[in-house]
Amino acid sequence: MITKLLLLAIFGIAMAHLEGVVVVYLRKALGMLDSESNKDSIEKFPVLYLKIEMSREAATIIMLFVIAWLVGGSWIEKGVFFLWTFAFWDLFYYLSLYILIKWPPRFTTIDVLFLIPKPWIAPVWFPISVSVLTILIITILALIGIF
């Protein structure tokens, strides 16, 4: 179990960095590298790019779902592995963006978390906190042998 969790964490981290790089290129192409808040940026996005971005988000969720499905045995394991990998992906996505372009500048910076089905907007501390909490809970459950 620990080996699977470790490998899924590595997968989530690598995927987060790849996605962070894509977002940096997208922001550069659209002239939005210096934007303080993604909430402001979304209003400047051409509709075509919003649809492309939504397809990227859907592909991300599909990849996380598929890896959890392939690695997990029971339905509970599949769900736990999805949440685990998602948490690492989300946490390290923000870390990757910060390393690459120093964004977000603060934990209180407002971000567009997802566009599907409608824009989810919140300060970045919220998804970071949820991810850290998810990782801690799953780690504790794994260490005490719950799954």
Predicted regions mapped to residue ranges:
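Aromatic-anchored segments of alpha-helical transmembrane domains
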Residues: A16-H17, T85-Y94
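Alpha-helical transmembrane segments of multi-pass membrane proteins
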Residues: I13-K28
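Active-site His/Glu-centered metal-binding helix of metallohydrolases
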Residues: V21, A59, L91, L95
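Cytoplasmic juxtamembrane interface segments
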Residues: E53-I76
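Hydrophobic core of alpha-helical transmembrane segments in multi-pass integral membrane proteins
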Residues: I61-A68, P127-L143
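Functional transmembrane or membrane-interface alpha-helices that line membrane-embedded catalytic
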Residues: R27-A58, L97-L133
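Sequence termini and other peripheral, non-core segments
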Residues: L5-I10, L136-F147
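Interfacial segments of alpha-helical transmembrane regions
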Residues: I2-G12, G73-F88
